[in-house]
């Protein structure tokens, strides 16, 4: 099977997944201010919330504009960041933010936030392609909202 994403009827999943969605909803709607409070009201532990929060989404959320955050470590060489930007453009990702640290010992940390609602491929394919760029040492998925 290709990809990591599935659409599953919640009736066949453990109740904990719906509780995580409930905690996320409480935070999103401003009904609670802290994760501890949201987890308590949803009937889950904070560790359960943190374990699943970046992997569980309501179906309606997946149809809206989505954002992905990922980090990279790149070598301090001419053209590396440009190559990554070209890949993001080619797959239809819309760059929202780029944050690059100063190179230390020849390596720089770069963080991207991109809108993936118009992308032509899935996130895993995009990250795999970026990982193949000469000068990209590490690519790490951080979060999706």
Swiss-Prot record:
InterPro entries: ACT-like_dom_sf (IPR045865), ACT_dom (IPR002912), UPF0735_ACT_dom-cont (IPR008310). This is UPF0735 ACT domain-containing protein CPE1414. Belongs to the UPF0735 family. It comes from the Bacteria. SUPFAM superfamilies: ACT-like. CDD domains: ACT_PheB-BS. Residues 69-144 form the ACT domain.
């Amino acid at each position: 099977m290709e990809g990591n994403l599935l659409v599953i009827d919640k009736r066949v999943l453990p109740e904990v997944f719906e509780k995580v969605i409930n905690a996320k909803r409480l935070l999103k709607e401003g009904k609670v201010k802290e994760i501890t409070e949201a987890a308590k009201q949803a009937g889950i532990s904070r560790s359960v919330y943190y374990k699943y929060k970046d992997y569980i989404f309501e179906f309606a959320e997946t149809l809206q504009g989505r954002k992905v955050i990922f980090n990279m470590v790149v070598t301090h060489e001419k053209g590396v960041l440009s190559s990554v930007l070209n890949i993001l453009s080619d797959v239809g990702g819309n760059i929202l933010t780029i944050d690059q640290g100063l190179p230390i010992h020849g390596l720089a940390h770069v963080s991207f936030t991109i809108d993936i609602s118009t992308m032509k491929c899935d996130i895993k394919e995009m990250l795999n392609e970026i990982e193949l760029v000469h000068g990209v040492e590490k690519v790490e998925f951080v979060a999706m909202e």
